Amino acid sequence: MDDHNLDYKGSGALEELEMLTVNAKEAQELILTKILERNQATEYLSKFMNGSTNISAFKRHVPVVTYDKVHPYILRIATGEESSILCGEYILELLRSSGTSRGEPRLMPSILKDLDRRTYLYSLIMPIMNKYISGLGEGKAMYLLFVKAETLTDSGIPVRSVLTSYYKSPHFLHRKHDLYNNYTSPDEVILCPDSQQSMYCQLLCGLVERQHVLRIGAVFASAFLRSISFLEQHWRDLVNDIRIGQLNSSITSPACRLAMLNFLALPNPELADQVEAICSCGSWKGILGRLWPNVKYIEAVLTGTMAQYIPMLEFYGGGAIPFVCTMYASSESYFGVNLSPLCSPADVSYTILPNMAYFEFIPLEDGLRLTDHEEVIENDKLVSLVDVKVGCYYELVVTTFSGLYRYRVGDVLQVTGFYNRAPQFKFICRRNVILSIDSDKTNEEDLHNSVTTAKKILENQNYLLLEYTSYTDISTVPGHYVLFWEIKSTHDERPAPLDAQLLESCCAAVEESLDYVYRRCRAHDRSIGPLEIRLVEAGAFDALMDLLVSHGSSINQYKTPRCIESSLALKLLNSKVIACFFSPQDPECGM
């Protein structure tokens, strides 16, 4: 990583990637050695290593930990103690995780060199894409990118999301505007902390540049679809701005208004007529290809529970625009890239880059039987990066330069193969998103698979499931699972009635698809009541996102929580319920 910028490096980047993956074992040993050398004097490592930088000693003595063990050190730094209690370098900022998997945001330490590592990974994306799609340098990218307002700790350390950190960094703002980093959105609009004003302006830029746009997307599919939903609601205002050459008065950000002058220098009634004709045609099926006729692909994270959004993307894309998932990253570290970006989202595997951090893996020996959040993991159970086995499931553990040592990220991965000596992983689920009433334990993937089975019943009746989440309602005896569903018609003509029998059959289908323990508790032990679907009004999940973003989540990193833990979020969703349906029968339990 000698050249830490976003300049397009072409085949040179791929040659470097080849060398890196061929020498994955050596790269990992070098990374860990450097981490130990730079951080050997920290209070945290000194407790276990006594100043040693020996790799074997690290593996014997440094424990595997969850956030609860790291949090006290981060709080001490946040309130004014030296970074050296955790990290040998100055902690530049604390990165706020999305906070939607466990309720409260987690704060991850970050140092200046972390930006180099993130930029290195970003610099690989376009060389990889150019292997599969030609002509990407001949147009622009409409990437809908957002920042979140940051806060300061008592000691003055910025607290921000990892993406806000990157978009505000010199690495992004001082990038050379070459052919492959040519975005429709001005930086000033991306950096607007008001996501509604930013979204409006970014969509307006994309419409003005519609003939030049070759790539569209956002970080997560949820953010992209939220933007398209926003476009459905506001296209008339956007068309009017284009027609008269003036920005809507609702945009009050001075930076946004100044940046948009170049896009609305003159009235453009011809373009306004084109966009109006497309947006007013009735059905929005396939509208992305009509609004941006030269688009070659949609880029967003569509793995894990983001796969929920594929049907809606297919609806808006008309089934004609490929989906691309390019990278795997989190607030803790950036991890890897997808070397086969045009594969089906269901087949996406990420090649771990061995120069990002030091990676270890907790084997999940019983398939997806997840280790308990508080379970003590014996050090000798961990497997190194190059020693994982194809087909096996693991929980990811990282050691970083910035002060995370053998930290359980919480992601469950399955090894799908190797690229040279670097393993390739499929993202399966987050460890701690579960529903449980009795002896049942339903994880995120179990829930996703069950909902996927049930939603086919809706699709056969010309409905799409837009969003869902869940919680365990123990106000009843026995307690039961509750699913909140938001549904949209996909048919130009009048769809089949959305009656009780249809939703009850969905309840039954979810239950039949859940595991044996759940079905036994329901049908035999009677320790779980019938599953309930609460249908919510249109826009309920947008309101949920607004609530969670207002409480610290980043709009870029936001993912709909698949299990609601916040009482405020639960109250909001219950206020949006328009009908309730229960499973009409016991599931089969084979007893």
From Swiss-Prot:
Name of the featured protein: Probable indole-3-acetic acid-amido synthetase GH3.11
Domain of life: Eukaryota
Annotated family: Belongs to the IAA-amido conjugating enzyme family.
Organs and tissues of expression: Expressed in etiolated and green seedlings, roots, callus and highly in flowers.
Pfam families: GH3, GH3_C, GH3_M
Coiled coil feature spans: none
Chaperone listed as a keyword: no
Gene: GH3.11
A single BP term in Gene Ontology: response to light stimulus
Induction summary: At low level by auxin.
Any one Gene Ontology molecular-function term assigned to this protein's record: acid-amino acid ligase activity
Cellular component, GO annotation: cytoplasm
EC class of the enzyme, as a word: ligase
The EC number(s) this enzyme carries: 6.3.2.-
Keywords for the protein's UniProt record, in alphabetical order: Ligase
Annotated function: May catalyze the synthesis of indole-3-acetic acid (IAA)-amino acid conjugates, providing a mechanism for the plant to cope with the presence of excess auxin.
